[in-house]
Amino acid sequence: MASLKSAYTQPAASAAGAVNWNAPDLTRHPPRSPRTRLGGFVHLPRLIDKARAVAAGTNGDFHYNCPMDQRFWAFTGLKPGPFMQQVKKGRTDSELLAYVMANLKPKRSPSEIKAWSAWYEQQAPDNPDSRGFFNDVHRKNAAQRKDIETWFDWLELDDYVTFGGKP
């Protein structure tokens, strides 16, 4: 069996045709993996994909400003509304990263961003309610998988299975 991480990079929906990341249709394919980094930040490319899809009305079941996004806002000191305004102006990934870096509160060093990203990538459910939700989806999607431990593992599995992959 291929590893989830290698399989996720080519989900069935994306492999069937090119994906337009400037206007992603999240009814046809998932956003980028939460592990994908931009400027050292994990989750930022995924957050951008969801924001662009919401702006285009093609977000499907994906939510902008979900609890995972809120952890990014908490670390950066940014707010979802002004960030969405930048997305709606058609900013590129690089321009959105420049916006993030210019508006960090407090300012963060590259080593702080790297440390936060490493920490965030390893986060697992931390209370009974979130653990129950996590376990329910894990059980439904791939109960036999023993390597699904973190929220990022869970998101990648859910995205992959939702868009036609076999766990």
Regions found by a protein language model. Name each.
Residues 33-36, 40, 61, 72, ...:
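Generic alpha-helical structural element
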Residues 2-14:
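Intrinsically disordered, low-structural-confidence terminal and linker regions
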Residues 70, 80-88, 114, 153-160, ...:
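Short alpha-helical interface patches
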Residues 11-59, 119-167:
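Polar/charged low-complexity regulatory segments
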Residues 59-100:
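Amphipathic alpha-helical packing elements
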Residues 83, 87-142:
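Amphipathic protein-protein interaction modules
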